Amino acid sequence: MAENWEPKIVGFCCNWCTYGGADTAGVGRMQYPPSIRIIRVMCSGRIEPSFILKAFKEGADGVFIGGCHPGDCHYDAGNYKWQRRVMMLYDMLDELGIEKERVMHEWISASEGEKFQIAMNDIYDKIKAMGPCTLKENTGKIDE
């Protein structure tokens, strides 16, 4: 692995909370790695395991999912839906030979810019230490 390798990380962030936390971090000029790409979704409950698998298939080395704190979901129970789906996702990742540690989820409100910054730096450091995702060599397995 090259020393200057930068992990590609995709972040799916809830519009109502975590995306607001990202905005708060930006307004506060809090730094996090530029190789993290944020995708705004209306709710973490809208995130399907197929979204995460597609991110890995397209070259992501790690995936972050951010949602509202339990009990604070704009759509009442979206974050609980994500919590149920993540267990199924971990089983899929295991079958594909992808470490479940490559997926991180966190509850971050719009006012928690510092928590967002810390989460981004944490996933970056963790994925950087793990190295590139090996799925790229086994991409065909996702289509099966």
UniProtKB/Swiss-Prot annotation:
Cofactor binding note of this UniProt entry: Binds 1 [2Fe-2S] cluster.
Record has Iron-sulfur as a keyword: yes
InterPro entries tied to this protein: MvhD/FlpD
Signal peptide (from-to): none
Cofactor: [2Fe-2S] cluster
Top-rank taxon, per record: Archaea
Protein induction: By selenium deprivation.
GO molecular function, one term: oxidoreductase activity
Family note: Belongs to the MvhD/VhuD family.
Assembly: The F420-non-reducing hydrogenase vhc is composed of three subunits; VhcA, VhcD and VhcG.
Protein's name in the database: F420-non-reducing hydrogenase vhc iron-sulfur subunit D
Organism: Methanococcus voltae
Organism phylogeny: Archaea, Methanobacteriati, Methanobacteriota, Methanomada group, Methanococci
Gene designation per UniProt: vhcD
